[in-house]
Amino acid sequence: MNEDLKTRRALPGAVAGRNVFRREGEYWMIVYDGELHRLPDTVGLRYLAHLLQRPGQQVPAVDLAGAVPTPGGPPRTAAAELARVKATRSIRAAMHRIGTHNAPLIAHLRATITTGTYCAYTPDPRLPVGWEF
């Protein structure tokens, strides 16, 4: 069976006309632009959900990746760089996976997600997108 489950069918009444980014066990239910997709859970999808829940907020990659320096661990600057790389790679991988299924959603995410030392979801205020989680 294909690891990425793509479902194009009539949407359940509960999500019709809505945008959904919701974890359901080992999968994520993603609905955007009338298309329903179920993707296996990944760290990148978790990071994206975290950002989508905080539109307009800059989230430090260290917080997003859960990288907290520990005594005897790498210096804070090294931990911050590792977190930045981990967050960026994970988010890009998740976006690539989404892009193979839903062109309108990946176009939206490419225009609104930034990664780096700080990561953010910054939707255009003139084109609001509401999400259910």
Task: Indicate where each model-derived feature is located.
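Intrinsically disordered, low-complexity protein-interaction/activation regions
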Residues: 1-133
